[in-house]
Design a protein with these regions (language model features):
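Alpha/beta-hydrolase-fold enzymes
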Residues: 1-46, 51-52, 182, 186, ...
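Short alpha-helix in the alpha/beta-hydrolase fold that links the catalytic acid
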Residues: 351, 365-374
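Catalytic histidine-centered segment of alpha/beta-hydrolase-like enzymes
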Residues: 363, 383, 387-402
Length: 422
């Protein structure tokens, strides 16, 4: 009886959110609110400028440092989020390359079923732990258990210091791939990108298509003009030039606040909903899941304001990528001492692609992701539309029962099986 009463809030929360969400969503998209949002952000920039001129310090930077230290300490002490054991095989500035293994300290390189490794590229926003939240809700474990040699890019806690442009992230993906190619003695690698990480993977594959065996995208933005989420509306109205001129960093707690502000009710109830989404009816597991999700939600690293500016202006505001007008600096090609500017043409992508779209995604609109397979030149391409939200794709019971087995099966069909001599 107690168990039944304990889990009835799941239905109540869903009903409560549904009945209040529509009106709040309308208000948060209104012209008045968007103008007030822009004015508010500009006032923060102006206030910080006055403080620096008159007092020689930035209260916003000081507050960010305090919040960051407090939450990092809290999260580290609260719960261990990493579930699947891994080794750090190399560190490039602040970026780490993780190599996952099974239940022992011996990596699976010699015993994996599939010879084609998989590199996971998470978004620069938040940390990668949401795709490895718990043993039975881990995307990493799904691939690992199926026999894939799994690697992960961990962008780190201090991205603002060493990743200043989109090019820097693309360069790190390339360096990671080169390291994995040498480690595994494989010419081509499977690539899986999530959210903004998926967008970065699209850019990478347009430049280095020949290095990739297949590409999995999950909730990846492409047609930003069609992204009608609240976050996208705010990005299009964000005074990013003024912010970039004043600050060197896009503070992590600013990003956390944006996720909260987009819909405080949903943001507050979602973590309860995700934690309650269990078929085991285990109160201990509910509390454990809630702690992990809460820790992840408040663990957003600072980004370089220069990178944030480029991503917002070139993609959210100008929509350059889908129109093949985005240009980035190649790290290797130099002309007269200058880095070579390369245009990103998505038609260069010819590899097999699986595009995973959440039909209820409120962070990346499905309309922004669905055009991916229409733009690339790949003949082997598939879209899976799943009745789920952005985070639910990663951790919901339904997704792990009905979505990820399909994804694993698709990747198995694109990967070579290891010979016994390997």
């Amino acid at each position: 009886m107690c168990i039944v009463l304990f889990f009835t809030p799941y239905a109540f929360l869903s009903h409560f959110v549904d009945t209040t969400n529509s009106k709040l969503d309308e208000e948060l998209r209104s012209k008045d609110f968007l103008q007030n949002f822009k004015n508010y952000m500009e006032s923060i920039v102006n206030l910080d400028s006055v403080q620096k001129q008159n007092f020689g310090y930035s209260s916003l930077s000081s507050i960010d440092s305090l919040i960051d230290k407090s939450l990092t300490s809290y999260n580290n002490n609260l719960v261990s989020i990493n579930q699947t054991p891994n080794n750090v095989i190399v560190q490039i500035d602040g970026t780490r390359i993780l190599h996952y293994f099974g239940g022992s300290n011996e990596t699976l390189t010699a015993s994996t079923k599939y010879g084609t490794p998989l590199l996971i590229v998470y978004a620069p926003i938040n940390r990668y732990h949401i795709i490895d939240l718990s043993p039975n809700r881990s995307i990493v474990n799904k691939f690992n258990s199926a026999g894939f040699d799994v690697f992960m890019i961990d962008w780190g806690e201090e991205q603002s210091k060493d990743k200043l442009t989109i090019s820097d992230y693309v360069d790190d993906i390339d360096q990671a791939l080169e390291i994995i190619r040498k480690t595994t003695n494989k010419e081509k690698i499977n690539l899986y990108g999530y959210s903004w990480g998926g967008t970065l993977c699209l850019i990478y594959c347009a430049l280095y298509n020949s290095k990739i065996k297949s590409l999995i995208l999950q909730s990846a933005n492409l047609d930003f003009d069609k992204d009608d989420t609240i976050i996208a509306e705010w990005m299009r109205n964000f005074p990013v030039e003024k912010f970039n001129d004043e600050f060197k960093e896009m503070f992590g707690h600013f990003i956390d606040s944006a996720f909260l502000m987009r819909n405080p009710i949903v943001h507050t109830t979602d973590r309860l909903k995700y934690a309650l989404d269990t078929k085991e009816y285990d109160i201990f597991r509910f509390v454990q899941n809630l702690a992990k999700i809460s820790a992840w939600i408040t663990n957003t690293p600072d980004l370089s304001s220069q990178f944030f500016r480029q991503f917002v202006i070139d993609l959210y505001q100008k929509n350059l990528l889908i129109n093949n007008q985005l240009s980035i600096q190649e790290k290797k090609g130099k002309v007269n001492g200058q880095k070579e500017i390369t245009r990103v043409d998505l038609k260069n992508i010819t590899i097999p692609i699986l595009n995973i779209v959440g039909n209820k995604d409120d962070l990346v609109s499905p309309k922004s992701s669905l055009p991916i397979n229409d733009i690339v030149s790949s003949r082997d391409k598939k879209t899976i539309e799943f009745p789920s939200g952005h985070i639910e794709l990663c951790i919901s019971y339904d997704a792990h029962q009905n979505l990820w087995p399909q994804v694993v099966e698709w990747l198995e069909s694109k990967s070579e099986i290891k010979s016994k001599s390997m």
